[in-house]
């Protein structure tokens, strides 16, 4: 029999409200509507299907404050993560959000009405307190960054009524709700279920870890990966799910089931481990594996861990009686080549030879095409990963040239395009500053905001082309560091980004200006001209610095080609 839900009752709002579906659907069409973001949709889905039981809606101020300060809802029930609906003042005014108001919550992807929210309160959270108490306060933490840079200033609390399930078009057969997963366990006759949380591909060590956990507790295994929002830079869930499906036959027949969890992770370490345990309990699991640095985001820019390696295990141990799910702490598994087996690191005698491949090393091997040994992963898993990670010679990249008007960046970009076309193997796209201004950003001016929008558009287009394996050459002025960095972050989701500072002096750019643009700017005929009456922020960390005053275009292009070659991007075989 599946474990009882957190709080004793599964708050399956979809099942509860299905008799009123026609009535609620009609009302939803008449109410003011709020389009939810991707993260809000993840939260809503687990609120509607009972994954966040005992919650029946987004947290009110009383619940929110209790969770932030004490891991407690107003009822006294244990809950460790704030589940909130953030809005801005304009939305409050537009939708007349106040206690008693009813609004429709809508999917931004297809305008589908999903739920009706009855507002209980609208409040301004103490974000600094939330950042400190829930996530540890480090400003580099992904969740803290989200709080300050993305989340709106106000939260809306209230109860939900379900109108429709969210529509999914991928791996639908694996997207079990808590009720469906519980029924599946009952059908299989499983009395004990060990749940395994992951946001990464699984390899031999993970298979060994989960089988050991099942063996020691006479249980079966629920592989329960997150397919909502995870850490930026993680391998996409499409690839990961194909990996899990490839791995499943490696378990003894009937031992393991794969189910997908549409969770938006916060990377909250100890707090998140408690939350994950509650979610798995609601899905019927009796046991939950908590490993080293569970749900931690790794290290900050100074190389300091956001959390201690076993903080998450200590946190769930503290609340184990209340959680009502047995936590299975596990050390990292490592390979012993002399005996051809895996073992937990804390059980390996001193002097025994071990081997391991880190996530960073694995990604490097995938990018370079180097061998991934069979002791580390199964051939069928590696095959899936390689399908999503082509060799370097087939990966896209972006060359982003920045510098003053008439610095030579356009000539360099054109010459580089010709050189790469001669090389072959990839399509090559060229985005010169004036071309982009004419074709993509004709309505934009030259205020800082408009300049940043222009670079954001270039970054978006470059990222999509990079993802599809193209070579992209962009040569805008791009005077501001933050906009350039944002473009880098967009592109680096899918491939390499190389920032080339064309550091030709302003004096030389002006002296050799045959079009007379600088002269017009000096005369006041052109306003907001970079280098004259608008600033240029030199790149802090360019990949390459060149100067068209002292170097020929040919030699600069050769330097860029050598840079690309050194990264394996121009290998033909």
Curated annotation (Swiss-Prot):
Protein name from the UniProt record: Sulfate adenylyltransferase
Region (N-terminal): 1-169
Positions annotated to bind ATP: 197-200, 291-294, 333
Catalysed reaction equations from the record: sulfate + ATP + H(+) = adenosine 5'-phosphosulfate + diphosphate
Source superkingdom: Eukaryota
Pfam families reported in the protein's UniProt record: APS_kinase (PF01583), ATP-sulfurylase (PF01747), PUA_2 (PF14306)
Quaternary assembly: Homohexamer. Dimer of trimers.
Function: Catalyzes the first intracellular reaction of sulfate assimilation, forming adenosine-5'-phosphosulfate (APS) from inorganic sulfate and ATP. Plays an important role in sulfate activation as a component of the biosynthesis pathway of sulfur-containing amino acids.
GO term, biological process aspect, one: sulfate assimilation, phosphoadenylyl sulfate reduction by phosphoadenylyl-sulfate reductase (thioredoxin)
Residues reported to bind 3'-phosphoadenylyl sulfate: 434-437, 451, 477-478, 515
């Amino acid at each position: 029999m599946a474990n009882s839900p957190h709080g004793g009752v599964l708050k399956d709002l979809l099942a509860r409200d299905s008799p009123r579906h026609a009535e609620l659907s009609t009302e939803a069409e008449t109410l003011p509507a709020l389009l939810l973001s991707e993260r809000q949709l993840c939260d809503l889905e687990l609120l509607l299907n009972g994954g966040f039981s005992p919650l029946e809606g987004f947290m009110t101020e009383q619940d929110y404050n209790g969770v932030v300060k004490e891991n407690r809802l107003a009822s006294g029930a244990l809950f460790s993560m704030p589940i909130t609906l953030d809005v801005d003042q304009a939305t409050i005014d537009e939708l007349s959000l106040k206690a008693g108001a009813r609004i429709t919550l809508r999917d931004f992807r297809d305008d589908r009405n999903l739920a009706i929210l009855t507002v209980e309160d609208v409040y301004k959270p103490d974000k600094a307190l939330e950042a400190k108490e829930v996530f540890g306060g480090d400003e580099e933490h992904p969740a803290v960054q989200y709080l300050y840079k993305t989340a709106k200033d106000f939260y809306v609390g209230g109860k939900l009524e379900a109108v429709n399930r969210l529509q999914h078009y991928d791996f639908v057969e694996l997207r079990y709700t808590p009720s469906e997963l519980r029924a599946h366990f009952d059908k299989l006759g499983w009395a004990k279920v060990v749940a395994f949380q992951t946001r990464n591909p699984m390899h031999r060590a993970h298979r060994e870890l989960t089988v050991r956990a099942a063996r020691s507790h006479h249980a079966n295994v629920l592989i329960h990966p997150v397919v909502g929002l995870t850490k930026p830079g993680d391998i996409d869930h499409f690839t990961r799910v194909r990996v899990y499906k490839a791995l499943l036959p490696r378990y003894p027949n009937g031992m393991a089931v794969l189910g997908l969890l549409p969770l938006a992770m916060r990377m909250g370490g100890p707090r998140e481990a408690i939350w994950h345990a509650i979610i798995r309990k609601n899905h019927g699991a009796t046991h939950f594996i908590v490993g080293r640095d569970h749900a931690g985001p790794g290290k900050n820019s100074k190389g300091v861990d956001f959390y201690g390696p076993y903080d998450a295990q200590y946190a769930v141990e503290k609340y184990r009686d209340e959680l009502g799910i047995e936590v299975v702490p596990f050390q990292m598994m490592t390979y012993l080549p002399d005996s051809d087996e895996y073992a937990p690191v804390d059980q390996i005698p001193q002097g025994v030879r071990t081997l391991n491949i880190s996530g960073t090393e694995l990604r490097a091997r995938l990018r370079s095409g180097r061998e991934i040994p069979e002791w580390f992963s199964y051939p069928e898993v590696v095959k899936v990963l390689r399908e999503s990670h082509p060799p370097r010679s087939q990966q896209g990249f972006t060359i982003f040239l920045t510098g003053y008007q008439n610095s030579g960046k356009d000539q360099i970009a054109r010459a580089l395009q010709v050189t790469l076309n001669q090389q072959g193997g990839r399509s090559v796209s060229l985005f010169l500053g004036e071309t982009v201004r004419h074709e993509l950003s004709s309505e934009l001016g030259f205020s800082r905001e408009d300049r940043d929008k222009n670079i954001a558009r270039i970054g978006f287009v470059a990222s999509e082309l990079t993802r599809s394996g193209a070579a992209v050459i962009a040569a805008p002025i791009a005077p501001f560091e933050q906009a350039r960095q944002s473009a880098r972050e967009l592109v680096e989701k899918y491939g390499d980004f190389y920032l080339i500072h064309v550091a030709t002096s302003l004096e030389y750019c002006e002296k050799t200006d045959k079009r007379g643009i600088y002269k017009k700017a000096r005369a006041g005929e052109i306003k907001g001209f970079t280098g004259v009456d608008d600033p240029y922020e030199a790149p802090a960390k360019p990949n390459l610095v060149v100067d068209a005053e002292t170097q020929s275009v040919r030699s600069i292009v050769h330097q860029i080609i050598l840079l690309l070659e050194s990264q394996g991007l121009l290998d033909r075989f």
